Amino acid sequence: MIGKLSGTLDDKNPPQVIVDCHGVGYEVLVPMSTFYNLPELGARVSLLTHFVVREDAQILYGFATSQERAAFRELIKISGVGPRTALSVLSGMSVAELAQAVTLQEGGRLIKVPGIGKKTAERLLLELKGKLGPDIGVAASVANDSQADILQALLALGYSDKEAAAALKALPSDVGVSEGIRLALRALGK
């Protein structure tokens, strides 16, 4: 398996790039988030990759971050979601946005991605719940350290990710930890 490519960026044509590694040019399909962050042609580039072998093709998918690659791998494990659809999802939203959509069970955000219908969005929400990593989900909904502490407190008290994130969203951004927990508990108690 090819896990990483480092070389010279020879060509950029969305969603495909060609990376020259010591005279061998590798075609790599990348999500748009990675594509927009690529350097100029002729510059050195390093991509984490996922290698897919099919009966009729061998395809490399490249990612700028390990979180993107991990999300891609989780997406392709889902029945009915292939590498192209997974690439489309990661092109349509960042990993943090995907994690937040899954945490808050917002299928409407997923439906906006080309190639994702209502049933596929529901399947993604169900299958990805808890699989994108707690650090990604927390980072998506937390603006500062006090909000992170409030979120952790609510989760420790047994509230679901969705309930805790919704309560956190309703709080003022400059609220302190103890006051934030009190306000969140009051909101959740209604």
Swiss-Prot record:
One Gene Ontology term, aspect cellular component: Holliday junction resolvase complex
Protein name: Holliday junction branch migration complex subunit RuvA
GO molecular function: ATP binding; four-way junction DNA binding; four-way junction helicase activity
Domain comment in the entry: Has three domains with a flexible linker between the domains II and III and assumes an 'L' shape. Domain III is highly mobile and contacts RuvB.
GO annotation, biological process: DNA recombination; DNA repair
Pfam families assigned: HHH_5 (PF14520), RuvA_C (PF07499), RuvA_N (PF01330)
Gene: ruvA
Role, per record: The RuvA-RuvB-RuvC complex processes Holliday junction (HJ) DNA during genetic recombination and DNA repair, while the RuvA-RuvB complex plays an important role in the rescue of blocked DNA replication forks via replication fork reversal (RFR). RuvA specifically binds to HJ cruciform DNA, conferring on it an open structure. The RuvB hexamer acts as an ATP-dependent pump, pulling dsDNA into and through the RuvAB complex. HJ branch migration allows RuvC to scan DNA until it finds its consensus sequence, where it cleaves and resolves the cruciform DNA.
SUPFAM superfamilies: DNA helicase RuvA subunit, C-terminal domain (SSF46929), Nucleic acid-binding proteins (SSF50249), RuvA domain 2-like (SSF47781)
Compartments in which it is found: Cytoplasm
UniProt similarity note: Belongs to the RuvA family.
Region Domain III, residue ranges: 142-190
Keywords tagged on the record: Cytoplasm, DNA damage, DNA recombination, DNA repair, DNA-binding
Region (Domain II): 65-137
InterPro entries (alphabetical): DNA_helicase_Holl-junc_RuvA_I (IPR013849), Hlx-hairpin-Hlx_DNA-bd_motif (IPR003583), NA-bd_OB-fold (IPR012340), RuvA (IPR000085), RuvA_2-like (IPR010994), RuvA_C (IPR011114), RuvA_C_sf (IPR036267)
Region span, Domain I: 1-64
Lineage: Bacteria, Pseudomonadati, Pseudomonadota, Betaproteobacteria, Burkholderiales
Flexible linker, as annotated region: 137-141
Subunit organization: Homotetramer. Forms an RuvA(8)-RuvB(12)-Holliday junction (HJ) complex. HJ DNA is sandwiched between 2 RuvA tetramers; dsDNA enters through RuvA and exits via RuvB. An RuvB hexamer assembles on each DNA strand where it exits the tetramer. Each RuvB hexamer is contacted by two RuvA subunits (via domain III) on 2 adjacent RuvB subunits; this complex drives branch migration. In the full resolvosome a probable DNA-RuvA(4)-RuvB(12)-RuvC(2) complex forms which resolves the HJ.
